[in-house]
Amino acid sequence: MTIDEKYMRRCIQLARNGICHAAPNPMVGAVIVRDGKIIGEGYHVRCGEGHAEVNAIASVKDESLLKDATIYVSLEPCSHYGKTPPCADLIIRKGIPRVVVGCVDPFSLVAGRGIQKLRDAGIEVTVGVLEKECRELIRAFVTFNLKKRPYITLKWAQSADGFLDIRREDGNAVRLSTPLSTLAVHKMRAEQKAILVGRRTALLDNPSLTVREWYGQNPLRLVIDRQLTLPTHLHLFDGSTPTLVFTEKEKAATQILTYVTLDFGQNILPQIMQVLFYEQKIQTLLVEGGSQTLQAFLEQGLWDEAFIEHARVTLHDGIPAPLLPHGQESRFFFRDGALIQHCRHAE
């Protein structure tokens, strides 16, 4: 590991602290080093507030040290005026002689302009240190801005013989997730801006789709209910957090419920993506079920990663689990006795 890589890893570590609040901005971390010592560091905490570079510079107790320092930043410093002034201008104004950048910002208003501005000011700029890891940090930001849709994560648990649940019209579902996996799901929910289920899952499982076993904000709850036949006593309609209902009916919104009319004679998933991108500005989406909903996302290529918990339980019959497309590479690990499969969409 080189010296630059060591400090860039710290940038990445810092950036992840913004996972719940930085969106729709990307997660970014910055570290300022002089004579082999960190003299300042920061990350982008919340959209509309100071960027990572601003917070790192503000943390330096003696600004005179900046004249001989290097600033490491996981993403190219911005060069345009948004909700805050350009970070590239701040770096130039503070007289920092060297900048190390993890990856170029793909956002059209930046896209290399920040780096060029720094170089035009006579600053030494190194680009591409731990580039893959730094791009990993901003994958949701990139997907949202380039594909015009949320970054989509699919999640389900299935039995050892490939079923999501027994066939039932009511009653309790078979418990497949371990307590630790349930905790991991709540962490995942806290990191998402919206969470979606189909009508059958909402009816039979009556999920809350809230964050209860982890710290964080509740995501926007989404449910597909074509005919508006879901009973109002379900947890989705309890008012604890907003819910958006996709339907073919026309219905006025309430304080806690928003109804979005779709053309169910056409493919509804692209319509949902348009609503989430253009109207709701949702950058990340977690799809929790059920089987038909998950399979529809898979078949239409509307997914970016999937987490599948393979339980030890066998059901012998029931609702078949979704099938991942062929050619997808997965990594596997054990968690609390269950086999977890993590797959990234290979396009």
Over which residues does each language-model region extend?
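Proteins enriched for Cys/Gly/acidic motifs involved in redox and nucleic-acid/cofactor modification
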Residues: H21-A22, V129-A157
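Short low-complexity, flexible loop/linker segments enriched in glycine and/or proline
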Residues: G114-Q116, A140-T143, V211-E213
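Enzymes that bind and transform nitrogen-containing heteroaromatic metabolites
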Residues: M1-P26, E41, K61, L65, ...
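N-terminal pre-triad scaffold of radical SAM enzymes
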Residues: A69-S79, K147-Q158
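Hydrophobic, well-ordered secondary-structure segments
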Residues: I115, E131, R135-I138, T182-R189
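Helix-turn-helix
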Residues: G29
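Short, flexible helix/strand-to-coil boundary loops that buttress conserved ligand/catalytic motifs
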Residues: C103, I138, R168
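Zn2+-dependent cytidine deaminase-like catalytic core
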Residues: I32, K37-E133, L220, A296
